[in-house]
From Swiss-Prot:
Protein name: Myrosinase-binding protein 2
Region Disordered: start-end pairs: 314-355
Compositionally biased spans, kind Pro residues: 314-346
Pfam families assigned to the protein according to its UniProt record, in alphabetical order: Jacalin
Gene3D superfamilies: Jacalin-like lectin domain (2.100.10.30)
Entry's Gene Ontology molecular function annotations: carbohydrate binding
Keyword Lyase: no
InterPro entries: Jacalin-like_lectin_dom, Jacalin-like_lectin_dom_plant, Jacalin-like_lectin_dom_sf
Entry's family note: Belongs to the jacalin lectin family.
Signal peptide: none
Reported induction: Not regulated by wounding, dehydration stress, methyl jasmonate, salicylic acid or abscisic acid treatments.
Disulfide pairings: none
């Protein structure tokens, strides 16, 4: 459902109405010496992009793009004024506000003070609804313009945003359902949320806030499962979130449960969208719920056929009775199947380190997939473990993250951790020993880098039976005091001779920003690169998975310079290597990526950025690139890739 807001401007020219789309990706505005003469809008509908143009005199063109579909336009503003000799008003300038809290440059004419020239206007939905289309009037110029915004359908149950009035309002709208939720924190508050919605067969992501710490995720088994309840707390900002589903599952609590509590829940309804307010944190959160579809009635059983009686058979004369054979001996009863032995319980190995802090115990899982380690001034201040249990990912985090961020160690799918080396030391200001460094070793012989500062006292955390590490426990507060683990027996069904299909090539660049990893997909469809004044400020990648195009998270921060696009002819074209440069720039502590160039099996892209500094190349012969990882803050500090073998089909001719 949409809300049509009245057009601002003059009453000449011919009326136009583009109608309602799924969203707006890009707006191009042209001007002459006096007013706005032309507008070109790139809309998206059901995964396809459509263009609408109004006005005829293109003049001087300027473009405004959003990080679509994560970001969308929430307000349309500008100015209009009467033009001498025309007898009516024309649009003199346009500007746009987005769900990221960004405001576009003024596209058109300004005053000497840099404000829109003429009578200013700002058109927006009451709750920050998404821009879905434009209407207005045009001839040789743009006479008037108005927007269509998303509006809540009367069949939906709308929960108004709970929280403060800071930040910018946004409303993602209503979809078929929710596939995944990602929640990121910054200290005690929720600073970032990303929702992956279902729209038919497509996945539509929307992100809000500022990504700082690595987000945690909650995956819904859509379409077999849906979210029935959203619970959270507000303490000035959003401080925690929790979800319940139709299968009786409850997500982990994301954040700290402090402040006033809210619950969004409606019997026989399911969650289909979110709204709220955000800036550098999530100020407020609301939701849209839709009624569950009525269950399809079971078909009535077909009536059973009426049996037709067969004619009575004529009895044949009875033969002479044969002598009865001796009865066969009864077969011996089959032996009862031997029940499979119950798996041995995991072995809990005592924590190594000091006695400070609070005890934590994550328990035992099927696998440890990834470890994040954050350093402090004196040792390991923070750890986060990413586990897998029955195919589902869970996380446990302990300690306190510092401004130094985190480093990570990822375990390949055909490998597992067998031991950890724990360095401990007595550090001034702490009453007991603390963990100063961690090193992890795996079954395939991989040894991680030392995370932290190694000390003379090194302790080995293992069970002595060749077991597989499946969970952690220990003690922590503002630092990690002690670390122990659970080990499960293994039959070594995983062998080092079976390599993982995908290779993760080490990221190149500086050590600033927060780690990110998009993961492994079938291929790459499109790359968007945004430049800053001194290097690459922003990247995002559109991947392919099965039959779906999936737009990954944006990494870095977009600037007013916008983005440039490199689009592949997928699936016949694929990336074979990434080349680039990284360098130290004034005012930034760690090196940043200054340039990126992408090579495919068909061509080479233009260089995005400035080719200055240390050169690098990410390439594996016989492999194609199917995912990216790295580090980013306000700039892109590192870039790395995931690559898989290229398989070629050969035809034999006889």
């Amino acid at each position: 459902m949409s809300e049509k807001v009245g057009a601002m401007g003059g009453n000449k020219g011919g009326a136009f109405d583009d109608g309602v789309f799924d969203g707006v990706k890009k707006v191009i505005v042209g001007k002459d010496f006096n007013n706005v003469t032309y507008i070109k809008v790139e809309y998206e509908k059901d995964g396809k992009f459509e263009i609408r143009e109004h006005g005829t005199n293109r003049g001087q063109l300027k473009e405004f793009s959003v990080d679509y579909p994560n970001e969308y336009i929430t307000a349309v503003g500008g100015s209009y004024d009467t033009v001498f000799g025309y007898g009516s008003a024309l649009i003199k300038s346009l500007l746009f506000k987005t769900s990221y809290g960004r405001t576009s440059p003024i596209l058109g004419h300004t005053t000497l003070l840099g404000n829109p020239a003429g009578k200013e206007f700002m058109l927006e939905s009451k709750y920050g609804g998404k821009l879905l289309g434009f209407h207005g009037r045009s001839g040789e110029a743009l006479d008037a313009i108005g927007p269509h915004f998303f509006a809540v359908n009367s069949s939906l149950k709308h929960f108004k945003p709970q929280g403060g009035n800071g930040g910018s309002a946004w409303d993602d709208g209503a979809f078929d359902g929710v596939r995944k939720v990602l929640v990121g924190r910054n200290g005690k508050f929720v600073s970032y949320i990303r929702f992956e919605y279902a729209k038919g067969e497509r996945t539509v992501p929307h992100a809000h806030g500022k990504r700082q710490e690595a987000p945690q995720e909650f995956v819904v088994d859509y379409p077999n499962e849906h979210i029935t309840s959203v619970e959270g707390t507000i303490d000035g900002y959003l401080s925690s979130l929790k979800f319940k589903t139709s299968k009786g599952r409850t997500s982990p609590v994301f954040g700290n449960v402090v402040g006033s509590k809210f619950v969004f829940e409606e019997t026989s309804f399911k969650l289909v969208g979110f709204c709220g307010r955000s800036g550098d944190a999530i100020d407020a959160l609301g939701a849209h719920f839709a009624p569950l579809p009525a269950p399809t009635p079971a078909p009535a059983p077909a009536p059973a056929p009426v049996p037709v009686p067969a004619p009575a058979p004529v009895p044949a004369p009875s033969p002479a009775p044969a002598p009865s054979p001796a009865p066969a001996p009864a077969p011996a009863p089959a032996p009862a199947p031997t029940p499979a032995p119950a798996p041995a319980p995991p072995n809990k190995v005592e924590a190594l380190g000091g006695n400070g802090g609070t005890i934590f115990d994550d328990g035992a899982f099927d696998h440890v997939r990834k470890v994040y380690i954050g350093q402090g001034d004196s040792g390991v201040a923070y750890v986060k473990f990413e586990y897998e249990k029955d195919g589902k990912r869970e996380t446990g985090e302990h300690g306190k993250m510092t401004v130094l961020g985190t480093e990570e160690f990822e375990v390949e799918s055909d490998d597992y951790i067998t031991s950890a080396e724990v360095s401990v030391d007595n550090v001034f200001g702490f009453k007991s020993e603390i963990v100063t460094s961690l090193v992890f070793k795996t079954f395939k012989g991989i040894t991680s880098q030392p995370f932290g500062m190694e000390s003379e006292k090194k302790l080995e955390l293992k069970d002595g039976k060749g077991g597989k590490l499946v969970g952690f426990h220990g003690k922590a507060s503002d630092v990690l005091y002690a670390l122990g683990a659970y080990f499960a027996p293994t039959t070594n069904s995983i062998t080092p001779s079976t390599p993982s299909t995908a290779k993760k090539l080490q990221a190149r660049g500086g050590n600033g920003g927060a780690s990110w990893d998009d993961g492994v997909f079938d291929g790459v469809r499109k790359i968007l690169v945004g430049q800053g004044n001194d290097g690459v400020a922003f990247v995002t990648f559109e991947y392919n998975k099965g039959s779906q195009a999936i737009l990954g998270d944006g990494h870095g921060k977009q600037t007013l310079l916008g983005t440039e696009t490199f689009e592949l002819d997928y699936p016949s074209e694929y990336i074979t290597s990434v080349e680039g440069y990284y360098d130290k720039i004034f005012g930034v502590e760690a090196e940043v990526v200054t340039s990126l160039t992408f090579k495919t099996n068909k061509r080479t892209s233009q260089p995005f950025g400035m080719t200055a500094g240390e050169h690098f190349e990410l390439k594996e012969d016989g492999y194609k690139i199917v995912g990216f990882h790295g580090k980013a803050g306000d700039l892109v500090h590192q870039i790395g890739v995931h690559a898989v073998p290229i398989f070629t089909n050969y035809r034999c001719v006889f």
